[in-house]
UniProtKB/Swiss-Prot annotation:
Domain Carrier: 580-659
Name of the protein: Nonribosomal peptide synthetase pngA
Single Gene Ontology BP annotation: fatty acid biosynthetic process
Reactions the enzyme catalyzes: 2 3-phenylpyruvate + H(+) = phenguignardate + H2O
Annotated source species: Aspergillus terreus (strain NIH 2624 / FGSC A1156)
Region (Adenylation (A) domain): 32-450
InterPro entries the record matches: AB_hydrolase_fold, ACP-like_sf, AMP-bd_C_sf, AMP-dep_synth/lig_dom, ANL_N_sf, PP-bd_ACP, Thioesterase
Organismal lineage: Eukaryota, Fungi, Dikarya, Ascomycota, Pezizomycotina
Region Thioesterase (TE) domain: start-end pairs: 681-933
Length: 946
């Protein structure tokens, strides 16, 4: 293996030299460590499971990545040197496909979570498409819906790549860039940071110089792999130091703060990362009765908690350091640090905290001195580039092997952030004291840092203006951050000019709630909202609000009278409009809410108060989600459910609606797949399997209208399946009219459901209703039950198993011949299928042999209903969606399109519209095809004007 030696010296201090062995690339690093003894491991936990992790050796990672790389090259046909966007929300997929992309000789780009604001999300995706030069994109089926409503980037779900049986792709030298990371930009667009192999390896060697680690210990990470602290500071550094690494989802640690300490003890963790806001929460947790005593002596392996991303309050962190010392950690366990995406995470560390900072009376901790590989200088604020003496605040600039050389495909950003002599301008204000310790003193430009994340106040202001909130005057909104005395983290303030009278408490409350909701949906920050008079919000001659002056006035207390008046008016509003719980569920939810929201905010909270009205943070929102899931006890609640039902009453109604769908005592065909949106709903009719789960992937992409599925009768105990086709149509027609009394209507049916949807449309039109959209998915009008019977029983039974994931595709192929005989009994078929099914998956679904047999019987009953049915009559119009014919049809694509699907023209009073779609009959809505299908489907829906 090729290696090289490099000498580093510690800049700005007495020179000490150390010889560090570097690999030529990250791939060579992984290859070497994977073959090294003793074996080290990657330990990953999942959401809801903090006790039984999945464990992979570094050799497992390498071998799986080589197979996955083969899928990228030979199935996805990536071009060497191109960018592959990786959009995941779990650690293992992020790591696996990061390495697979490198092995495939491509450039991985670590996608950050998308904004909940649709406009912001679309702008971001368009920007990525342009900047990354139309990248390929990998994601999971559960995240595919986040790409809805745009055509800039088309994702592929990794579940469809099926790489396990592929041969290994050999490792070879690739390009200089190892990974692309994203960071915020002043314009609101992210900047793309290319980290090279040489740059990352220099960073890893510098960290190794700074952090000698004990043998047989691990490193712990709880942030996403899209963050440089996770990817470089923990994942790659653990490989470099031949250490175990432990990864756990963020929500688990934030929901149960002391789990952080449990994991440190359980896995002998010696090094981890935590920003200031989390350390403040940890201090509060350890201050509770008996909590500290529980961990006495349990943290003896812990050497370093690196803390960066936001300022560390010396008093707060010192208190925590003393507590951790009682638990067995070293006295200087907390290491305040400075780092950026552009420096491969931490590069300047204070290993003398807290002693140095306490002795020198620093209110915020110093970030210390440089590791090998980076140098700093402080230059005058006037921009002339001259250095300033120790103790003088100036602009912080950096250079060295660990610092990027320029942004990806962004020469303007590169030019603006580098000096003429190639020093990188960080945008931070700082000074170096007489001992060479770096102390940060704020930001050169407007910036908000909350919970370790960096936000542009301009983005928040723009989102509020774009929301057209009735209670404020556009253009007079100002957002800034402040560090209140004795606080542990920054607070976001939003001031605005109201257009209501001061006595209008209803408008005041509604406006504040709307502003907080927009801020949360856009960037996930907590906000204090304050209305001011126009005299307090004067604009410059260029029409701009002076954010700096407004912030200074707020911090001086110039707005104190406005704050007091606002608090009084809001308290009055809550007093006269307080609403009590009206059900046991609302009472239970109220308990969860009040335990999650800070105590000083719970007094005025009621069942009609928006959580955004209380300024709930994104972290508290995740904790609230977990608390409600624990309360209801049946699976996860999508985060968007909480965000779109932000009061106890609306959330209670939403939960009850879902619970009713699980109530087997009353048959109701209507299943709410998506409840939001103001456009007319879309009704989706099941295929011959009778279940609407198949539409779940599609429903994720439809956000502007409710999505209702129609589920067959017969799944639950005591339910008789339908007996006739006419009974199906009349039942569904009545349910549609009850839920949506008037049109225009939008209906679509898949396969068998296409015939049902067609007759429902006829029934609606017969009663004078308008059916503006009728979608017919991959079924010709001429195909009847007799023709379907030969394939439907075995095909649909296997499709059920495939759809719910109890049998993989290779298993389907294996047992298919055993289901060939025409006289095979249902019981024998069920036994054959159950013998091949994944036992664990069956248990997860609660799918027993009897339940599967009931499902098969329902399918058979639905078949009987259509045996003698023939399509007749006509509707105003229709959209027919079709893929290539099944092999069992033994016809050409052209015959299928013209002689079968094309026959719908005989049953429409205007020419039908035909749409060819990807996939096979049973996979058009699967993960690998849903993204392309939903674009075609939603375009057709919109083209019909509904």
């Amino acid at each position: 293996m090729n290696k090289k030696l490099k000498l580093f010296s510690m800049p700005g201090a007495q020179t000490s030299q150390i010889v560090i062995m570097l690999f030529q690339s990250l791939l060579h690093l992984l290859e070497a460590i994977a073959s090294r003894e003793p074996t080290r491991y990657i330990i990953t936990y999942s959401i809801g499971n903090t006790h039984t992790p999945e464990i992979f050796s570094y050799s497992d990672l390498l071998q799986s990545a080589r197979k996955a790389a083969g899928a990228l090259r030979f199935k996805y046909h990536v071009v060497p040197g191109s960018v592959v966007l990786l959009h995941f929300n779990d650690h293992w997929n992020s790591m696996l496909w990061f390495w697979a992309t490198l092995i495939a000789d491509c450039i991985p780009a670590m996608s950050t979570p998308f904004s909940n604001n649709p406009e912001t999300r679309l702008r971001h995706l368009k920007h990525l498409s342009t900047t990354l030069r139309s990248p390929k994109c990998l994601t999971t089926a559960s995240l595919a819906a986040e790409f809805a409503g745009q055509e800039y980037i088309t994702p592929i779900c990794v579940q469809s790549l099926d790489y396990e049986n592929l041969v290994h792709l050999p490792i070879k030298e690739g390009g200089d860039i190892a990974v692309l990371m994203f960071t915020s930009g002043s314009s609101g667009h992210c900047k793309v940071v290319p980290l090279t192999h040489e740059q990352i390896l220099a960073s890893l060697s510098g960290k190794a110089w700074t952090f000698p680690l004990p043998d047989n210990t691990a490193q712990l990470n709880w942030v996403g792999m899209n963050h440089v602290a996770s990817l470089v500071e923990v994942h790659l550094f653990s490989i470099y130091t031949h250490s175990d690494q432990v990864h756990i989802p963020t929500v688990e640690v934030l929901s149960h703060v002391t789990l952080f300490l449990d994991l440190i003890h359980r896995h002998r963790v010696s090094r981890t990362f935590a920003p200031n806001f989390f350390l403040a929460k940890l201090r509060a947790a350890l201050s509770a009765d008996d909590t500290l005593a529980k961990y006495t002596g349990s943290l003896s392996n812990l050497r370093y908690i690196v803390s960066g991303g936001e300022a560390n309050v010396t008093q707060t962190i010192n208190d925590l350091a003393q507590m951790l010392k009682k638990c067995g950690a070293v006295s200087n366990v907390i290491v305040p640090a400075f780092g950026m995406t552009e420096t491969c995470a931490g590069a300047i560390y204070n290993t003398s905290f807290p002693q140095y900072d306490v002795e020198h009376g620093l209110p915020f901790a110093s970030v210390g001195s440089c590791m090998p590989g980076i140098q700093v200088r402080i230059v005058q604020l006037n921009g002339n580039g001259n250095s300033v003496p120790p103790g003088t605040v100036g602009n912080l600039e950096i250079c060295g092997p660990v610092v990027l050389k320029g942004y990806f495909n962004d020469p303007a950003a590169t030019k603006s952030t580098f000096t003429n002599d190639n020093w990188f301008k960080t945008g931070d204000l700082a000074f170096v004291d007489d001992n060479g310790m770096l102390v940060l003193a704020g930001r050169e430009k407007d910036s908000i840092i909350v919970n370790g994340a960096n936000y542009s106040p301009h983005d928040i202001e723009s989102a509020i203006d774009e929301a057209n909130i009735p209670g404020l005057i556009s253009g007079f909104t100002c957002c800034f951050s402040t560090f209140p005395p004795s606080a542990d983290t920054e607070e976001v303030i939003i001031v605005y000019l109201p257009n209501y009278t001061p006595a209008d408490t209803v408008r005041r409350s509604e406006t504040a709630a709307a502003i907080r909701k927009v801020a949360m949906m856009s960037v996930g920050v907590r906000a204090t909202v304050l209305p001011l008079d126009r005299t307090m919000l004067e604009k410059s001659t260029l029409g701009k609000l002076a954010r700096g002056k407004i912030k200074a006035a707020y911090e001086r207390g110039d707005y104190k009278s406005y704050q007091e008046a606002n608090e009084q008016m809001m308290a009055l509003h809550h007093k006269v409009s307080h609403h009590q719980p009206r059900s046991g569920l609302e009472q239970s939810l109220l308990g969860v809410f009040t335990r999650t929201i800070p105590e000083n905010l719970t007094e005025d909270f009621d069942v009609l108060t928006s959580i955004f009205d209380l300024g709930i943070t994104s972290i508290e929102l995740l904790k609230l989600k977990r608390g409600i899931e624990d309360l209801i006890g049946h699976g996860q609640i999508p985060l968007i459910t909480l965000m779109t039902n932000p009061t106890i009453r609306t959330l209670s109604d939403a939960l009850k609606q879902h619970a009713q769908q699980r109530d087997c005592s009353i048959y109701n065909p209507v299943v709410v797949l998506q409840s939001q949106g103001k456009k007319p709903p879309i009704w989706l009719v099941h295929p011959v399997g009778g279940e609407v789960m198949i539409f779940m992937n599609l429903a994720k992409f439809i956000i502007d209208r409710p999505v209702y599925g129609l589920r067959a009768r017969g799944f639950n105990d005591g339910e008789d399946p339908f007996h006739t086709f006419e009974e199906i149509v009349s039942t569904y027609h009545a349910s549609i009219k009850e839920k949506q009394p008037s049109g225009p209507y939008a209906i679509a049916g898949y396969s068998y459901g296409a015939k049902v949807a067609f007759d429902i449309a006829k029934a609606l039109e017969h009663n004078g209703d308008e059916v503006r959209f009728l979608g017919l998915l991959d079924l010709p009008p001429s195909l009847n039950g007799t023709q379907m019977r030969a394939v439907a029983w075995k095909e649909m039974l296997l499709h059920i198993c495939r759809m719910v994931g109890v049998i993989r595709e290779e298993g389907i192929k294996k047992i298919y011949p055993r289901l060939e005989p025409e006289n095979i009994s249902p019981r024998h078929a069920i036994e054959t299928v159950m013998g091949e099914a994944d036992v664990t998956r069956l248990a997860e679904l609660g799918l027993t042999a009897s339940a599967l047999e009931r499902w098969a019987n329902l399918t058979h009953a639905l078949q009987r209903c259509i045996v003698d049915h023939k399509t007749n009559g006509s509707v105003a119009g229709a959209d027919a969606f079709y893929c290539d014919p099944m092999a069992s049809m033994a016809i050409s694509n052209e015959q299928w399109a013209c002689d079968y699907i094309g026959k719908w023209s005989d049953h429409t009073r205007s020419p039908p519209r035909f749409h060819h779609i990807a996939g096979t009959h049973y996979t058009i809505l699967d993960a690998e095809n849903i993204f392309s299908f939903q674009k075609t489907f939603l375009r057709a829906l919109n083209d019909r004007g509904i």
